[in-house]
Swiss-Prot record:
Highest taxon in the source lineage: Eukaryota
Function as written in the Swiss-Prot or TrEMBL entry: Mediates sodium- and chloride-dependent transport of taurine. Mediates transport of beta-alanine. Can also mediate transport of hypotaurine and gamma-aminobutyric acid (GABA). Sodium-dependent taurine and beta-alanine transporter. Chloride ions are necessary for optimal uptake.
Protein name stated in the entry: Sodium- and chloride-dependent taurine transporter
Residues the record lists as Phosphoserine modifications: 322
Localization of this protein: Cell membrane
Sugar-bearing residue positions: 163, 179, 190
Region (Disordered): 1-42
PROSITE patterns: NA_NEUROTRAN_SYMP_1, NA_NEUROTRAN_SYMP_2, NA_NEUROTRAN_SYMP_3
InterPro entries: Na/ntran_symport, Na/ntran_symport_taurine, SNS_sf
Tissue-specific expression: Expressed abundantly in placenta and skeletal muscle, at intermediate levels in heart, brain, lung, kidney and pancreas and at low levels in liver.
Basic and acidic residues bias (residue ranges): 1-18, 29-42
Keywords: Cardiomyopathy, Cell membrane, Disease variant, Glycoprotein, Membrane, Neurotransmitter transport, Phosphoprotein, Symport, Transmembrane, Transmembrane helix, Transport
Amino acid sequence: MATKEKLQCLKDFHKDILKPSPGKSPGTRPEDEAEGKPPQREKWSSKIDFVLSVAGGFVGLGNVWRFPYLCYKNGGGAFLIPYFIFLFGSGLPVFFLEIIIGQYTSEGGITCWEKICPLFSGIGYASVVIVSLLNVYYIVILAWATYYLFQSFQKELPWAHCNHSWNTPHCMEDTMRKNKSVWITISSTNFTSPVIEFWERNVLSLSPGIDHPGSLKWDLALCLLLVWLVCFFCIWKGVRSTGKVVYFTATFPFAMLLVLLVRGLTLPGAGAGIKFYLYPDITRLEDPQVWIDAGTQIFFSYAICLGAMTSLGSYNKYKYNSYRDCMLLGCLNSGTSFVSGFAIFSILGFMAQEQGVDIADVAESGPGLAFIAYPKAVTMMPLPTFWSILFFIMLLLLGLDSQFVEVEGQITSLVDLYPSFLRKGYRREIFIAFVCSISYLLGLTMVTEGGMYVFQLFDYYAASGVCLLWVAFFECFVIAWIYGGDNLYDGIEDMIGYRPGPWMKYSWAVITPVLCVGCFIFSLVKYVPLTYNKTYVYPNWAIGLGWSLALSSMLCVPLVIVIRLCQTEGPFLVRVKYLLTPREPNRWAVEREGATPYNSRTVMNGALVKPTHIIVETMM
């Protein structure tokens, strides 16, 4: 059969299962319910909905508070070398892979792998475990940001001075550092900053350790409840509501980041901060940790291996040119990370000059930047209340759209397992409320007096780079060596009208697996047990709990392989062959098309059904 005829068969094969679904609940059509057919899934109402949702999903807190710090720590401009190697060798290929298999199969993060390779459907379960754990702790950052935002609506910022009930006799205002003679005299004593005391003694009420959980912080618990409610109402109606919310949440942070960038560049000391950020140190490339940081940053910032991008792609129309937009979104994501460094380090340079210290003494990453370094910087600027409100609104919006996109990915992956049940009526909305409630209750462990230790345990292990690298390796291995990169390229050509360059295919087959394995091994070799603030050492039971969180996702892949082999009858090699064969996209839709035979290469009791590219071949 000619290539054009094969592609026409693919087009006919998909035309029914990829229609939009204007039902009363996302993905449900009344006529489907009446006829007893599985509900069809909805689609994005416009292309911009998808673009903004993806942009909001992966342009988040890591772009602002993690990339700039890693860049300065790992050799400044020299860090961009391993960063771009991992970007083009693994980040963009895996990002596009997840989007395109979602679009091609019209399925979420679990069921797409059920169709592509049932034996390795554990990839989807691993992704859902990771994103479920991530959703529990990531939103706690937004609860902290909400608390800081509320505290910013005061004439005087509460972390600017030492005259509050939570301050200790050792509190020393940062303005004292300007007087170097006074500072040298008192620096031998253990004095602390009012910003640190506000963070540790007011916001966290930090306990001595993880084995001292203390009482619940009700103010933070209410902030956590508030952000979960916002997240719920942003996604409860499916992608048609999510696609509209991101018009604001995904664009407004860029405007505020631009304002902060302009303000930072006009401050004294900004030039020194930017030089510190980008000054290259090529010798740092000899350290394997630099390459590990580059690889893990790519996977974190592109939100891959979480099932979220696959779920977002599954709502695309079949003919949507996602390849073009994935490349543009990649430029946006990495460009935002790079520009954020100018905004952050210009302000850190100003703060270092004001305090008369080295920039290395004020540079922070993660929560240390968001809740210590930057709040301290705004107290030294004119109109500190205004800049504090602006910063924490930006932080909230950056985190919120990432959060509800990841929750949407989690929900879509789970709903697609039982579409006939969970897409009827208001069951999907009830299920979302249930998932959000459980996640909120688990998150309460992180807003106790010992909650910061629990938060760091989740952050260090549950969604660590090791887990993401593990999933990425199997994704590429299955597509390149089992399903076949050329077979997927056939589907891509049918969807977007042309075949992408071979770069993607070679990356899936060789480059990405090699980078993942190398980074995975070095991560284990360079592993350092978790500490808090470089002083508190976690007990052994907590370290064991952390590794249990990491293994809970990683073990899904081999565990599902064993379960599937045990559940399937027949000789071992026959079972393996059967489980490595893709399944039909949607049996009822296919049968309506009358495309038969499906089981011309049946392995067991007529149960084996070929994927679309094999079905086309049988119709020659």
